[in-house]
Amino acid sequence: MALQAASLVSPALSIPKEGKSSVCLKDSSLFGISFSDHLKSEFSSSTLRCKRELNQQIGAIRAQTTATESPAVNKATPDGKKTLRKGSVVITGASSGLGLATAKALAETGKWHVIMACRDFLKAERAAKSAGITKENYTVMHLDLASLDSVRQFVDNFRQSGRPLDVLVCNAAVYLPTAKEPTFTAEGFELSVGTNHLGHFLLSRLLLEDLNKSSYPSKRLIIVGSITGNTNTLAGNVPPKANLGDLRGLAGGLNGLKSSMIDGGEFDGAKAYKDSKVCNMLTMQEFHKRYHEETGITFASLYPGCIATTGLFREHIPLFRILFPPFQKFITQGYVSEDEAGKRLAQVVSEPSLTKSGVYWSWNKNSASFENQLSQEASDAEKARKVWELSEKLVGLA
């Protein structure tokens, strides 16, 4: 934009950043020859007209630039080298826990602008400030995944902001392990699956178009999974185990009239969360199957480790919250801090070595990433297709 504006300016007229003309009549002379008041008046009037016209032209250029996508490579640099522009990443649930730690890790590099998509605007602003994220590296936007109308409004607001979308991270989650009765989203879906899966499903589908338009070298859509939904692990076999069954509950709308559980069974808050994570991992694979080859977008899921002190467990019984962190630290040794987990998710967002699509990433005890295996159900291609098609109907895309 600066280059375009400069081309409109006559070489004899310099316009500083403030938009003030460098032409000055304070001395009322030119090469030692005094101006008459009449000439000074005419010259000043001409200068003002020139300034107004120039400002109008620059304003038009700014408007055109705002309406177009920012190129991934900035052409104008002091040393003449091409540089990659700052990436733009949307992270849901970025006001606490893993989401906030990831936002911090990315913002600290100075290479990313983080859109913190959160339900509580003020909480997100306070969290960003507390984490030391500088204002130029983040924007808070309202998003309530328990309302499909809110999801659509977020997409509209994001597009109106004029920002490109280079990476989408679906991180937010509801976990209600002690709930005896189901609660529901604005549209009447069981809250855990409605938020963790259906809200993210609609968000991802709508923003896929924006991701595809990005000129960034490595566009990515990342959905956070969980070991608890992966029944080929020890943690995944702790009752109640994830099991989507024949999807009769999902087909029925999860509204409680028949069943609020995906498999059509009795409500169980812990199982509802685990089932939603299976849906997340199935959705990632179906995105990869349908869109990776066509768009070049990397679709991935991950389990960053057990963040035993995260607020995700705030609804658990007090004894669990006391005993679970030391159990993970000293017995299973699967514990990771929020900061470490955030750095791992940030790797999946930005590392050139983690661009393989259709992968479920995990980390070993040496903090090295590797492609993990999903359970039979979480990698069932036919079930992934059915979950996709039923979800399309529930969110109004089919």
From Swiss-Prot:
Q: Name one Pfam family in it.
A: adh_short
List locations, semicolon-separated. Plastid, Chloroplast
Which CDD domains is this protein grouped with? LPOR_like_SDR_c_like
Family to which this protein belongs? Belongs to the short-chain dehydrogenases/reductases (SDR) family. POR subfamily.
GO CC, sorted alphabetically, is: chloroplast
- GO BP, sorted A to Z: chlorophyll biosynthetic process; photosynthesis
A single GO molecular-function term is: protochlorophyllide reductase activity
Enumerate the Gene3D superfamilies for this protein.
NAD(P)-binding Rossmann-like Domain
Known catalysed reaction(s)?
chlorophyllide a + NADP(+) = protochlorophyllide a + NADPH + H(+)
Name this polypeptide is given: Protochlorophyllide reductase, chloroplastic
Q: In which pathway does it act?
A: Porphyrin-containing compound metabolism; chlorophyll biosynthesis
Q: What is its main location?
A: plastid
Relate the protein's function as given in its record: Phototransformation of protochlorophyllide (Pchlide) to chlorophyllide (Chlide).
What residue stretch is labeled transit peptide in the record? 1-64
Q: What organism does this protein naturally occur in?
A: Cucumis sativus
Keywords tagged on the record: Chlorophyll biosynthesis, Chloroplast, NADP, Oxidoreductase, Photosynthesis, Plastid, Transit peptide
Q: What is its EC number?
A: 1.3.1.33
